[in-house]
């Protein structure tokens, strides 16, 4: 039986319920500590970085992989 992974989009939708960087970091730390599957961890990291970019751009939403390069300089 194949294991089902949460996709980047799945994690992004979960992270979009959060409107502050502080709360995002709390959820990120929790998931980072509890996830064990490498694919899930990679997808979660990608989605968290994506959400950080959305938050630093004033809450503007971007499709996965479509964050403007100019926004990334503000993501820590």
Curated annotation (Swiss-Prot):
InterPro entries: Hemolysn_expr_modulating_HHA, HHA_sf. Disruption phenotype: No effect on expression of pathogenicity island 2 (SPI-2) which is usually repressed in culture; derepression of SPI-2 in double hha-ydgT deletions. Double hha-ydgT deletion mutants lead to deregulation of many genes at least 2-fold, most of which are also deregulated in an hns deletion, suggesting there are a large number of hns-regulated genes whose expression is also modulated by Hha and/or YdgT. Upon infection of C57BL/6 mice a single hha mutant has 10-100-fold reduced virulence compared to wild-type, while a double hha-ydgT deletion is 6 orders of magnitude less virulent. Keywords: Transcription, Transcription regulation, Virulence. It comes from the Bacteria. Gene3D superfamilies: HHA. Pfam families: HHA. Binds to H-NS and modifies the range of genes it silences; H-NS alone silences 'core' genes while the H-NS-Hha complex (and presumably also H-NS-YdgT) silences genes acquired by horizontal gene transfer. Plays a role silencing virulence factors in the absence of factors that induce pathogenicity. Belongs to the Hha/YmoA/Cnu family. This is Transcription modulator YdgT. It comes from Salmonella typhimurium (strain SL1344).
């Amino acid at each position: 039986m194949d294991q089902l992974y949460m996709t980047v989009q799945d994690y992004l939708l979960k992270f979009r319920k959060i409107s502050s960087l502080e709360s995002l970091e709390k959820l990120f730390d929790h998931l980072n500590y509890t996830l064990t599957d490498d694919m899930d961890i990679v997808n979660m990291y990608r989605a968290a970085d994506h959400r950080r970019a959305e938050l630093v751009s004033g809450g503007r939403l971007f499709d996965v992989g479509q964050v403007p390069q100019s926004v990334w300089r503000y993501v820590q």
